[in-house]
Curated annotation (Swiss-Prot):
Chief location category: nucleus
Species for this entry: Rattus norvegicus
Region (Modulating) residue spans: 1-138
Domain comment in the entry: Composed of three domains: a modulating N-terminal domain, a DNA-binding domain and a C-terminal ligand-binding domain.
Its biological purpose: Receptor for retinoic acid. Retinoic acid receptors bind as heterodimers to their target response elements in response to their ligands, all-trans or 9-cis retinoic acid, and regulate gene expression in various biological processes. The RAR/RXR heterodimers bind to the retinoic acid response elements (RARE) composed of tandem 5'-AGGTCA-3' sites known as DR1-DR5. The high affinity ligand for RXRs is 9-cis retinoic acid.
Protein name from the UniProt record: Retinoic acid receptor RXR-gamma
UniProt record similarity statement: Belongs to the nuclear hormone receptor family. NR2 subfamily.
């Protein structure tokens, strides 16, 4: 294979076993030369003698402590071309290379042979890969590609699932042949008896499946216990009590087809909202753990969510109204009046995205209260001193609402999700109301922080 190698490689004087060779030599092979061309017409290569191995600078120099990391980094990066040039003041140790010694000891092209474990001369600097590092595990049962070690044996997902089902359901199989069926990738489903027996023979453990099932049961019980703790900490009964406590005390809403003629719809809505804002603080104080927060955080949460909280209330109150909304004052605002007042677009969204959806799913007051509590406990409200505590309270309300819907409406597994889907619409409509100054008369000249602070400092009135 290397018989003609001498025609393409020119070794300089003093290389290998020639008389001019003394000690270690730094060399570079010349380029291939055409036969018959004199060497004088090409660049010459000179031997550069290397002295004894050099060490790093003496202890005490600033760079001495960085010597070892510097060598590692430069070795990993490697020089772009040629030999590595050591920076001034640093002497790098030139480690002896067994591969370099092998090359230097060659005296002729016939003596050049590939190094053991290497595919050829060209890959001299790359160590061979160990055979074990490329081995891929196969399923011990059917020979398919293994997805890992399952129940003590490397197996594929198919055999893993088969064994687990067999153990968990305590299945019993029979073989139609002689109990020696071939189990491979193509025929593994042919005989369940022989497949199961092979699982056992190859080392799959029944107890591993049983332990896995026990861990799953314990995990489910733990999650249920945590959820139960959340329900006890945020009982839906108290949330419902808060809703009922602030319900407008009007015996009758009167004729819902007639609305006040003294004011325009926007004024009526603002007046009703102004009255409801006082009861909103009373409602929030009745929600479990809200009063445990700092007074400043209570103000921030109410300031961040008052518009959504009020919109949710009058939307749910309006499910019995045809094409309009019912205010806490007992006044009914029709769609046509809202359009004539210039707030028709946002009014239509309230009817379509909130009132209509609440009516279709027959949202009850407990669910409404939970949704409002979720809005109230907003951990993203700016300025909170302890947002993580607020987030924990919100998660407890989530758990309470989910448990309530599962217990009250077991035939509607998707009800919890449908309830939560009203929250983005409520947020969007609330922001739009502020954008249109929908409640511009609500506060007047009083800053909202001071306004809410005065109400929060008022003792809770039990009625």
């Amino acid at each position: 294979m290397y018989g003609n190698y001498s025609h393409f490689m020119k070794f300089p004087t003093g290389f290998g076993g020639s008389p001019g060779h003394t000690g270690s030599t730094s060399m570079s092979p010349s380029v291939a030369l055409p036969t018959g061309k004199p060497m004088d017409s090409h660049p010459s290569y000179t031997d550069t003698p290397v002295s004894a191995p050099r060490t790093l600078s003496a202890v005490g120099t600033p760079l001495n402590a960085l010597g070892s990391p510097y060598r590692v980094i430069t070795s990993a990066m490697g020089p772009p071309s040629g030999a590595l040039a050591a920076p001034p003041g640093i002497n790098l140790v030139v480690p002896p290379s067994s591969q370099l010694n092998v090359v230097n000891s060659v005296s002729s092209s016939e003596d050049i042979k590939p190094l053991p474990g290497l595919p050829g001369i060209g890959n001299m600097n790359y160590p061979s890969t160990s055979p074990g590092s490329l081995v891929k595990h196969i399923c011990a049962i059917c020979g398919d590609r293994s997805s890992g070690k399952h129940y003590g044996v490397y197996s594929c997902e198919g055999c893993k699932g088969f064994f687990k089902r067999t153990i968990r359901k305590d299945l019993i199989y029979t073989c139609r042949d002689n109990k020696d069926c071939l189990i491979d990738k193509r025929q593994r489903n042919r005989c369940q008896y022989c497949r199961y027996q092979k699982c056992l023979v190859m080392g799959m453990k029944r107890e591993a499946v049983q332990e896995e099932r026990q861990r799953s049961r314990e995990r489910a019980e733990s999650e249920a216990e945590c959820a139960s703790t959340g329900h006890e900490d945020m009982p839906v009964e108290r949330i419902l009590e808060a809703e009922l406590a602030v319900e407008p005390k009007t015996e009758s809403y009167g004729d819902m087809s007639v609305e006040s003629s003294t004011n325009d719809p926007v004024t009526n809505i603002c007046h009703a909202a102004d009255k409801q804002l006082f009861t909103l603080v009373e409602w929030a104080k009745r929600i479990p753990h809200f009063s445990d927060l700092t007074l400043e955080d209570q103000v921030i949460l109410l300031r961040a969510g008052w518009n959504e909280l009020l919109i949710a209330s009058f939307s749910h109150r309006s499910v019995s109204v045809q094409d309009g909304i019912l205010l806490a004052t007992g006044l009914h605002v029709h769609r046509s009046s809202a359009h004539s007042a210039g707030v028709g677009s946002i009014f239509d969204r309230v009817l379509t995205e909130l009132v209509s959806k609440m009516k279709d799913m027959r949202m009850d007051k407990s669910e409404l209260g939970c949704l409002r509590a979720i809005v109230l406990f907003n951990p993203d409200a700016k300025g909170l001193s302890n947002p993580s505590e607020v987030e924990t309270l919100r998660e407890k309300v989530y758990a309470t609402l989910e448990a309530y819907t599962k217990q009250k409406y077991p035939e509607q597994p998707g009800r919890f999700a449908k309830l939560l889907l009203r929250l983005p619409a409520l947020r969007s409509i609330g922001l739009k109301c502020l954008e249109h100054l929908f409640f511009f008369k609500l506060i007047g000249d009083t800053p909202i922080d001071t306004f809410l602070m005065e109400m929060l400092e008022t003792p809770l009135q039990i009625t």
